[in-house]
Amino acid sequence: FSAAGLYNVTVSVTDSSGLTSTVGRQVVVYDPSAGFVTGGGWIMSPAGAYKADERLSGRATFGFVSKYLKGANKPTGETEFRFQAGVLNFYSNNYDWLVVGGARAQYKGTGVINGRGSYQFLLTAVDGDLIGKGTADRFRIKIWHRDDSTNADVTDYDNQINSTAAGSDQEGTVIGGGSISVKIR
């Protein structure tokens, strides 16, 4: 791939009997020198986002920074997300990767909810000012854990209700206050 980004790669294999199997994976291509992202503010968390009680909605606050230090191959920073109606307090403890491209930045890592557990998260931030004056900033966070008995990923929180917007500048929820800044180097 010639540019940093998230790419969906699909491989199809057909055996001598004509049976076909297809497997898809997302491939992350990052450039540690591409830039960084920072933001803080709040969103109105939609009903359906908090999987423990999908009826809940209301204000959720966030604060984050993700960047590569010089010579590093993993980003550093902090991420905090609080959804008071669901008594969900998420804090990051490690980052895996960061991709910055255009008005959008996305990064993945691990963290804890209410000081416990082992959760993964994916944060997407869109800087509306880089799209055009008057365009709103957008924020998405998906938090999940691995079910030990089934070895399946289980979503705990995801404010991306409209899955067709994923991967675009319309991904996430318009922020109600605060700002998101994607800095391209």
Briefly describe each language-model feature range.
Residues 22-29:
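C-terminal edge beta-strand
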Residues 60-121:
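Predominantly extracellular/secreted and cell-surface proteins with exposed
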